[in-house]
């Protein structure tokens, strides 16, 4: 099941997936300056997962760097007895890095259900495949015991793990889109610094309001690129484009593609110049220095640190 389809299914519930994650993100913003987020957010995380999984007895356990349960639970709801670290479902969840249930254990694998005191386990695994915690579920109603619920819990677990690993500066940004963009920019900078991979930024600044042009820019987006619409300190609308794995030659190729699209949409002779558009470029520094990027974003493009964190 795709993430989009899952979000559509959840949208009919009292709180959509996005609004639930927004609540967690706001909590994370409040705590981000104080260090790690898992411990102080554990109860909130368990409550959100319980809302979608309908379970009434569960606990959230941290996982160490070796992939083992670490100490006591950080949050508990309902009647939960102490958990055996050798519990079958826990071990399967840690090994697979995915949601496991007692139904799957018994029916699909022929395991002995008496080897577990649980009904299901949900891992919190981020986009970098780091396992941060496990939610051990002891009791959930029969109506919730289905693939849809488990798929949704897996999706939520991944989103929550990404949030827990968020860069503190990015968490302070005003919008989810800005946070998402800044985290991808951080990753592109690390790729440049650690792996000598190219990366480019391009800011298209519109001197005049032009919705059809903004739509054309949106439609010009390539597969790996990321775009965000912003209004800078000069009160001009613009689009910041992150181009991972793209050098200066690749940027020229993108600009040719964009020019072709402009001709197609607006007619021969129309260019960014004729539309009174300024284009700003920046190549990510392979040595990881941020001075040039700082000047590009905050001086040349006229943005502020609430719109873009570095």
Positions of the model-derived regions?
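Regulatory loop-to-helix N-cap segments in sensory/regulatory domains
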Residues: 110, 138-153
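Regulatory sensory and allosteric helical modules in signal-transduction proteins
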Residues: 63, 70-72, 79-111
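Signal-transducing coiled-coil linker helices
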Residues: 29-45, 175-180
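Conserved helix-loop-beta segment at the catalytic/binding core of cyclic-nucleotide signaling proteins
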Residues: 214-250, 260-269
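Signal-transmission linkers at sensory-effector interfaces
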Residues: 2-33
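A short, aliphatic-rich beta-strand micro-motif
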Residues: 117-126
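Short beta-strand-to-loop transition segments that serve as allosteric relay/switch motifs
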Residues: 134-143, 243-246
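Active-site-proximal structural segments of metal-dependent nucleotidyl cyclase/transferase enzymes
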Residues: 184-206
């Amino acid at each position: 099941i795709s993430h989009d389809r899952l979000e559509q299914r959840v949208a009919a519930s009292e709180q959509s997936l996005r609004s639930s994650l927004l609540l967690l993100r706001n909590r994370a913003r409040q705590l981000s300056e104080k260090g790690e987020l898992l411990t102080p957010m554990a109860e909130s995380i368990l409550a959100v997962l319980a809302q979608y999984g309908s379970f009434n007895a569960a606990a959230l356990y941290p996982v160490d760097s070796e992939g083992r349960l670490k100490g006591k639970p950080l949050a508990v709801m309902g009647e939960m007895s102490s958990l055996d670290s050798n519990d079958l479902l826990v071990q399967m969840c840690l090994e697979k890095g995915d949601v496991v249930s007692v139904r799957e254990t018994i029916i699909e694998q022929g395991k002995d259900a008496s080897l577990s005191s649980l009904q299901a386990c949900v891992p919190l695994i981020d986009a970098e495949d780091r396992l941060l915690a496990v939610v051990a579920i002891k009791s959930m109603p029969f109506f919730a015991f289905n693939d849809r619920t488990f798929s949704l819990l897996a999706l939520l677990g991944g989103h929550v793990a990404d949030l827990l690993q968020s860069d503190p500066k990015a968490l302070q940004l005003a919008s989810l889109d800005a946070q998402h963009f800044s985290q991808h920019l951080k990753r592109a900078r690390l790729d440049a610094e650690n792996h000598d991979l190219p990366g480019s930024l391009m800011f298209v600044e519109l001197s005049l309001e032009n919705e059809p042009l903004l739509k054309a820019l949106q439609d010009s987006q390539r597969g790996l690129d990321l775009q965000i619409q912003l209004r800078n300190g000069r009160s001009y609308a613009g689009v910041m484009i992150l181009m991972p794995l793209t050098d200066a030659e690749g940027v020229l190729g993108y600009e040719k593609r964009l020019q072709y699209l402009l001709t197609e949409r607006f007619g021969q002779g129309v260019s960014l110049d004729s539309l009174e558009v300024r284009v700003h470029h920046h190549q990510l520094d392979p040595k990881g220095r941020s001075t040039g990027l700082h000047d590009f974003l905050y001086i040349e493009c006229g943005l502020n640190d609430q719109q873009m964190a570095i």
